From Swiss-Prot:
Strongly expressed in calls, roots and flowers, to a lower extent, in stems and siliques, but hardly detectable in leaves. GO terms for biological process: auxin-activated signaling pathway; cell cycle G1/S phase transition; regulation of cell division; regulation of cell growth; rRNA processing. It is found in: Nucleus. It comes from Arabidopsis thaliana (Mouse-ear cress). A motif (Nuclear localization signal) lies at residues 357-367. Residues 355-372 are annotated as: Interaction with RNA. This is ERBB-3 BINDING PROTEIN 1.
Length: 392
């Protein structure tokens, strides 16, 4: 690597304070957007309206940033707002004509993302439309996803491997008599790259394999935990429900249909690198052109998958910066009240007891107290209590 390449790499990594600021600014916006969307999740609310509200909020908030920058800075939605209910695994972000509404008692998964200058913050959260504390299998599956996310946060650290996380989250889900859903991938994030080459599998299988890799300092990951009360093997029911796509920049196939060429030109101009929703395209032409674009690899679809009717699926997704002083989780939201459950498994208890931040070396107790008086955050995270469902 040349010295220029090394400098460019450094300027785009967490060693640059400006990069850290952009990640955290994107996270602040998407965390607020999640609150806005949650407030709209009520019985009889139209799902497409909620999705539109989430995306609009992110666009409005990011539009006011870096307006006076000398170079044009891309910013906005990094992943369209999705509202996936009950046994729907994810990626449900319907077209404007869709009449789907939320109902009382629905388990709602919200998935969304924001970026500033291509530095991406993603978040996923699960909420049940009911008053008071949760119970039964709905509570179990949310607790399973949340505890698995807490364990993943402690294992996505320099020196650990992606396979360590895959094995651990499955063990956690089993403690709640739930399954981690197959086919869900957690990716390293880089500037303008939502699906980096370092990948954590939700479930390893002969059909789905990735290279074993080690986490390293100054990397960023979006960790996506999806748990189910069912068998964790979701199915595609209707290809027409797919509305989220991402352009594959490596494909150069010459499209035949005029509608396809029009659509791909529009996508290149408006969504060159981030996933987008077909709602953002001219609907009639999109219907005609998207099929050829997908068939020839120009677009990567994000399909809407389902577990069996009666199953419940919960998601917790977060973005984490692997800083020199430890892991910094920058996206989250507080869960509803869950019943306490004691985890007996010593290995899971051990994972939950791991700190997230590194201890400061050579610091004396007095100095630590002084820092505390000034309101500085402790550099050693509180270990999780394995006897309760600690909430985000």
């Amino acid at each position: 690597m040349s010295s220029d390449d090394e400098r460019d790499e450094k300027e785009l990594s967490l060693t640059s304070p400006e990069v850290v600021t952009k990640y955290k600014s994107a996270a602040e916006i998407v965390n607020k957007a999640l609150q806005v969307v949650l407030a709209e999740c009520k019985p009889k609310a139209k799902i497409v309206d909620i999705c539109e509200k989430g995306d609009s909020f992110i666009k409005e908030q990011t539009a006011s940033m870096y307006k006076n920058s000398k170079k044009k800075i891309e910013r906005g939605v990094a992943f369209p707002t999705c509202i996936s209910v009950n046994n729907t695994v994810g990626h449900f972000s319907p077209l404007a004509s869709d009449e789907s509404v939320l109902e009382d008692g629905d388990m709602v998964k919200i998935d969304m993302g924001c970026h500033i200058d291509g530095f991406i913050a993603l978040v996923g959260h699960t909420h049940v439309l009911q008053e008071g504390p949760l119970s039964g299998r709905k509570a179990d599956v949310i607790a399973a996803a949340n505890t698995a996310a807490d364990v993943a946060l402690r294992l996505v650290r320099p020196g650990k491997k992606n396979t360590d996380v895959t094995e651990a989250i499955q063990k956690v889900a089993a403690a709640y008599d739930c399954k981690i859903v197959e086919g869900v991938l957690s990716h390293q994030l880089k500037q303008h790259v939502i699906d980096g080459n370092k990948v954590v599998l939700s479930v390893s299988s002969p059909e789905t394999t990735v290279d074993e890799v080690e986490f390293e300092e100054n990397e960023v990951y979006a960790i996506d935990i999806v748990a189910s009360t069912g068998d964790g093997k979701p199915k595609l029911l209707d290809e027409k429900q797919t509305t989220i796509y991402k352009k594959d920049e490596s494909v150069n196939y010459q499209l035949k249909m005029k509608a396809s060429r029009f659509i791909i030109s529009e996508i290149k101009q408006n969504f060159p690198r981030m996933p987008f929703t077909a709602r953002s395209l001219e609907e009639k032409r999109a219907r005609l052109g998207l099929v050829e674009c997908v068939n020839h690899g120009h677009l990567q679809p994000y399909p809407v998958l389902y577990e069996k009717p009666g199953d419940f699926v919960a998601q917790i997704k977060f973005t984490v910066l692997l800083m020199p002083n430890g892991s910094d989780r920058i996206t989250s939201h507080t869960l509803q009240e869950l019943p306490k459950k004691t985890i007996e498994d010593p290995e899971i208890k051990g994972w939950l007891a791991l700190g997230i931040k590194k201890k400061k070396g050579g610091g004396k107790k007095k100095k630590a107290q002084k820092a505390g008086e000034k309101g500085e955050a402790s550099t050693e995270a509180e270990p999780m209590d394995a006897s309760s469902n600690a909430q985000e």
